[in-house]
Amino acid sequence: MRCPACHHNGTRVLDSRPAHEGRSIRRRRECESCNHRFTTFEMIEEVPLIVVKKDGTRQEFSSDKILRGLIRACEKRPVPLETLEGIVNEVERELRGQGKNEVDSKEIGELVMERLANVDDVAYVRFASVYRQFKDINVFIQELKELMERDDR
């Protein structure tokens, strides 16, 4: 590792510890030449996950985009942000665990809705109405019936 102060190539690691929820390692280093101390982070380089949208276009997976949709669906609902972040993390973990490079947006939406249904029924219906693009009231009513049947079990 090259020292940022004197550009000498020799450094030694003084301390290492997990960072960012275990997804990276924080290392405290010291230059062997000038004794300058600095911090580095080491993380796994993940292969980008590509989302295939309904129209066939492709874009890189964005956990922020899912979180924004969940926040919108949960507006004025008693759902903590940590719960929504947990849903996003679970969905991303499941998708990356499949080992595929591409995933359909439909699969992402279904995974999100599956988890959101266990958190808040109103938020679930809001999310579903946007995600499934309800065309008329009958589709909306059918979704509500399915939700009520699921809750009765």
Curated annotation (Swiss-Prot):
Residues 49-139 form the ATP-cone domain. It holds the Pfam family Zn_ribbon_NrdR. Its cofactor is Zn(2+). Residues 1-22 are annotated as: Disordered. Signal peptide: none annotated. A zinc finger (unnamed) spans 3-34. GO terms for biological process: negative regulation of DNA-templated transcription. InterPro entries: ATP-cone_dom, NrdR-like_N, RNR_NrdR-like. One of its GO terms (molecular function) is DNA binding. Keywords: ATP-binding, DNA-binding, Metal-binding, Nucleotide-binding, Repressor, Transcription, Transcription regulation, Zinc, Zinc-finger. Binds 1 zinc ion. Negatively regulates transcription of bacterial ribonucleotide reductase nrd genes and operons by binding to NrdR-boxes. PANTHER family: TRANSCRIPTIONAL REPRESSOR NRDR. Belongs to the NrdR family. This is Transcriptional repressor NrdR. It comes from Halalkalibacterium halodurans (strain ATCC BAA-125 / DSM 18197 / FERM 7344 / JCM 9153 / C-125).
